A protein has these predicted regions:
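Long, basic N-terminal domains or extensions that often function
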Residues: 1-136
Length: 136
C-alpha cells in the first residue's frame, strides 16, 4: 500500500490555474504590455475564490483576487464577487454584462424589437449577424 498525503485544495488550485491560463490556446490572440502572455483580449483581472477566501497566485503580473469589473463604459466600477451562485446577477447588475450568450441574445433581440416598433420598421432577421453581435 502506498499512502500519499493529501494536498490542500488552495495549493492545488494556485498551481493549476496559472498553468491552465498560460496553456489555453486561442485561435486568435494578442500580447499587450511587457508580458509574454497571449490571450484573446487583454487579461486584466483573475477572480479565484474558494470558501470565501482568495486563492493567491499570479499570472504575467496579474494577481488573483475577489474583485472584477463589468462593462468598461456602463459598469459601476470594481466590485467584490461574493458567491458563485449570484455572480451572474452581480455582473449583470453592477457590471452591466450578460454572462451567457442566451442572455445577451435576449437583450439584443428585445432592443431590436423595441427600436423597430418605435420607428415603425420591420426587422429582417439575419441569424449570422445576430450571432456575431451576441459574441462581441
Amino acid at each position: 500500500v502506498i499512502e500519499t498525503p493529501g494536498r490542500d485544495a488552495t495549493d492545488i488550485i494556485a498551481e493549476a490555474v496559472p498553468a491552465i491560463i498560460r496553456g489555453f490556446h486561442w485561435p486568435k490572440s494578442m500580447r499587450w504590455g511587457t508580458g509574454d502572455l497571449r490571450w484573446v483580449r487583454p487579461l486584466q483581472r483573475i477572480v479565484c475564490v474558494l470558501d470565501g477566501k482568495v486563492v493567491p497566485f499570479e499570472v504575467d503580473g496579474i494577481s488573483s483576487g475577489d474583485e472584477t469589473e463589468g462593462h468598461r463604459v456602463h459598469g459601476r466600477g470594481p466590485f467584490k464577487v461574493t458567491f458563485r451562485k449570484n455572480y451572474e446577477s452581480q455582473l449583470s447588475g453592477a457590471g452591466h454584462v450578460k454572462l451567457t450568450r442566451d442572455a445577451r441574445r435576449e437583450v439584443i433581440l428585445a432592443g431590436i424589437e423595441k427600436v423597430c416598433a418605435e420607428a415603425g420598421l420591420e426587422w429582417i432577421e439575419d441569424k449570422g449577424l445576430l450571432e456575431e453581435v451576441v459574441g462581441l
